[in-house]
């Protein structure tokens, strides 16, 4: 009898809170409300939300469980909220789990959060500035050598990309590319994403009160998080034991010294080892599968468009001779490559639905009132497919970005105060990996000619998952075998 009684009490409290909230909102000029309350069960949510703009306009509300959420579906509304009024919408709602005061991605806006972001960004962009590009180049060359050993054999390229991006982050954070460590980290990230995407976890987004009831899925998620934390704690201990003042070989060294330097600072800005721990976690969770998925989408699109692949290879051959140095600062010398990356990010953004924002104070968007604590969700993919902005928005057409000033910058990594911390790293990885891959290989479908599906799998997590597919990597310094390959 205890469990049903507890559930009834929770429902009564939630209902009372909801009625009180609705009464307070009655005099405000709010965005229109979409009918229904099962919107978040749609298999391709960003596209579904974009479709609602036909009747409701680019900004509207949807009901998520017992609360209303505002959805932004255009560049104009997203930029107004996250750039022009970034302080108003820099907050985060209470999330499902985790060390909220330590988490950079999910933590709420505060002086401590700002200090945490500053240290993490400094570690990535200053601490690893000189070693990041050579490291990515080295690991990409090793990746190409592994792929050359499988030349002509169909390869599940997404798994290879995922291991590569995990190796890069392991080197940046831990200073270690040991294959056993990387495999352990990679498996942990995959387990976390799989657990997070399970319906038993996703339902908590719609009905948060269910988190107080027994939930095997939630217990499994917590167990995986504990395994993840054990790995990170081991690395932190090793780094502390070998730390030398004024020297660093990776991001952990840099951040540990940064924490030590501000030990006597103000309490509201004072960081500690737990912040370093969560910075590492955020980088692995946010930077492994997202970049690997974007690279996989790029390969899939190029398999469907061999004429663009051929033009890219001609550009690379013209600008980069054998053994030439590939430098990101010279990226504008490869305009078609940069345009192709931009087009892949437009059609398949790193995070199609940005993590929810919370209004830190009463504000407005497009003339609509947004009360304090209202949750805002920017539909990045929806904005990238807006027919009012993009010509033939669903078409893969990199040339659209070859005309300067004609197309807006896409917010594929978010924007404003909450822009993805790893954006510079991800853009560098996309540039180096695609350039070296297309220099070394021609991308071909399997012998049966099957092309990958360009329809994302049902969306429930961070990125747009690509259906599994295989690709043959034909070394360009070898003549294609007489098996009907395209040149």
From Swiss-Prot:
Positions that bind progesterone: 228
Q: Does the keyword Oxidoreductase apply?
A: yes
Q: What class of enzyme is it?
A: oxidoreductase
Q: How does it sit in the membrane?
A: Peripheral membrane protein
Protein keywords: Endoplasmic reticulum, Heme, Iron, Lipid-binding, Membrane, Metal-binding, Microsome, Monooxygenase, Oxidoreductase, Steroid-binding, Steroidogenesis
Under the heading PROSITE patterns, the entry gives: CYTOCHROME_P450
| Residues given in the record as 17alpha-hydroxyprogesterone binding sites | 228
| EC number of this enzyme | 1.14.14.16
Q: Which is a Gene Ontology cellular component entry for this protein?
A: endoplasmic reticulum membrane
Gene Ontology biological process terms, A to Z: steroid biosynthetic process; steroid metabolic process
Cell location:
Endoplasmic reticulum membrane; Microsome membrane
Record's Pfam families? Answer: p450
Query: What GO molecular function annotation could you give as one example from this UniProt entry?
Result: heme binding
Q: Which cofactor does it need?
A: heme b
What reactions does this protein catalyze? progesterone + reduced [NADPH--hemoprotein reductase] + O2 = 21-hydroxyprogesterone + oxidized [NADPH--hemoprotein reductase] + H2O + H(+); 17alpha-hydroxyprogesterone + reduced [NADPH--hemoprotein reductase] + O2 = 11-deoxycortisol + oxidized [NADPH--hemoprotein reductase] + H2O + H(+)
Sequence positions that bind heme b: 92, 117, 357, 418, 420
Task: Give the family, as the similarity comment puts it.
Answer: Belongs to the cytochrome P450 family.
PANTHER family (alphabetical)? STEROID 17-ALPHA-HYDROXYLASE/17,20 LYASE (PTHR24289), STEROID 21-HYDROXYLASE ISOFORM X1 (PTHR24289:SF17)
The entry's function note states: A cytochrome P450 monooxygenase that plays a major role in adrenal steroidogenesis. Mechanistically, uses molecular oxygen inserting one oxygen atom into a substrate, and reducing the second into a water molecule, with two electrons provided by NADPH via cytochrome P450 reductase (CPR; NADPH-ferrihemoprotein reductase).
Q: What is known of its domains?
A: The leucine-rich hydrophobic amino acid N-terminal region probably helps to anchor the protein to the microsomal membrane.
| Protein name according to UniProt | Steroid 21-hydroxylase
Natural source organism? Mus musculus
Q: Which gene encodes it?
A: Cyp21
């Amino acid at each position: 009898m205890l469990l049903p009684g507890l559930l009834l009490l929770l429902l009564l409290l939630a209902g009372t809170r909801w009625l009180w909230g609705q009464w307070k909102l009655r005099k405000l000029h709010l965005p229109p409300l979409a009918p229904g309350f099962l919107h978040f069960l749609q298999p391709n949510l960003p596209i579904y939300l974009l479709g609602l703009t036909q009747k409701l306009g680019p900004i509207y509300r949807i009901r998520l469980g017992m609360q209303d959420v505002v959805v932004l579906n255009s560049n104009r509304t997203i930029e107004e909220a996250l750039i022009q009024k970034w302080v108003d919408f820099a907050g985060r709602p209470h999330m499902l789990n985790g060390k909220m005061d330590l988490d950079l991605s999910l933590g709420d806006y505060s002086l401590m959060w700002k200090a945490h972001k500053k240290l993490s960004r400094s570690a990535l962009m200053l601490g690893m500035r000189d070693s990041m590009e050579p490291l990515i180049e080295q690991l990409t060359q090793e990746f190409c050598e592994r792929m050359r050993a499988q030349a002509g054999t169909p390869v599940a390229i997404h798994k290879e990309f995922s291991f590569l991006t995990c190796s890069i982050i392991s080197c940046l954070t831990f200073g270690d590319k040991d294959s056993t460590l990387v495999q352990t980290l990679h498996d942990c990230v995959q387990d976390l994403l799989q657990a997070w995407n399970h319906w038993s976890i996703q339902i908590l987004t719609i009905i948060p009160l269910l988190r107080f009831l027994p939930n095997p899925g939630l217990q499994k998620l917590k167990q995986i998080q504990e395994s993840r934390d054990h790995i990170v704690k081991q690395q932190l201990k090793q780094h502390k034991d070998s730390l030398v003042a004024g020297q660093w070989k990776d991001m952990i060294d840099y951040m540990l010294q940064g924490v030590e330097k501000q030990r006597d600072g103000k309490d509201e800005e004072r960081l500690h080892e737990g912040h370093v721990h969560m910075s590492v976690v955020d980088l692995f969770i946010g930077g492994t599968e997202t970049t690997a998925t974007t690279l996989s989408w790029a390969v899939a699109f190029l398999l469907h468009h061999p004429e663009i692949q051929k033009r890219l290879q001609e550009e690379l051959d013209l600008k980069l001779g054998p053994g030439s140095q590939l430098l990101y600062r010279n990226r504008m010398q490869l305009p078609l490559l940069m345009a192709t990356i931009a087009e892949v990010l437009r059609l398949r953004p790193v995070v199609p639905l940005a993590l929810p924002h919370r209004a830190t104070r009463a504000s407005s968007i497009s003339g609509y009132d947004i009360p304090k604590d209202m949750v805002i969700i920017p539909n990045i993919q929806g904005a990238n497919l807006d027919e009012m902005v993009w010509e033939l928005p669903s078409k893969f057409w990199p040339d659209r970005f070859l005309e300067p000033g004609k197309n807006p910058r896409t917010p594929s990594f978010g924007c404003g105060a909450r822009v993805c911390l790893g954006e510079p790293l991800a853009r560098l990885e996309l540039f180096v990996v695609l350039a070296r891959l297309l220099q070394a290989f021609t991308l071909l479908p399997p012998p049966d000619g099957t092309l990958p599906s360009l329809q994302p799998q049902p969306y429930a997590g961070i990125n747009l998952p690509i259906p599994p597919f295989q690709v043959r990597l034909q070394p360009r310094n070898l003549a294609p075998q007489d098996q009907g390959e395209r040149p």
